[in-house]
């Protein structure tokens, strides 16, 4: 029998429709040194209904089509984030900041996979801003605490490409910003 060797890799094309995102918020100063804010962010995750991959190497494309992994259904739903923040001005050159937001998972367990994880996050952030003449320095740290999600391996699979397992995610995001006023 002839043996066919599968190429070690293949270039690919992937079609992804990114969602519409709309946000709005309000802020006010209950006292001169304290700024409080609240935002609402709506994301149309339902636009990201599936991800289609086309492998340019024909052997890979055939293999992936046969396994039904060329199309990954996501079945994501629209989601709304709620965000709250505070900035306290210590003096004319220093501000302290803190925030919190809740970001619900847009995807169901039936389509959960490691390529596009979907977790509900509770995020907290802290920061400090320092003004030196016309130079503004800002430092921040954000910690996203993702919930743990367990996807089972249904027979038959609800969605090709779903990956059974328990997934958790925590993200730490440091930020630095330097700006200058002319």
Regions inferred by a protein language model and the residue ranges of each:
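Outer-membrane beta-barrel porins/channels
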Residues: 1-182
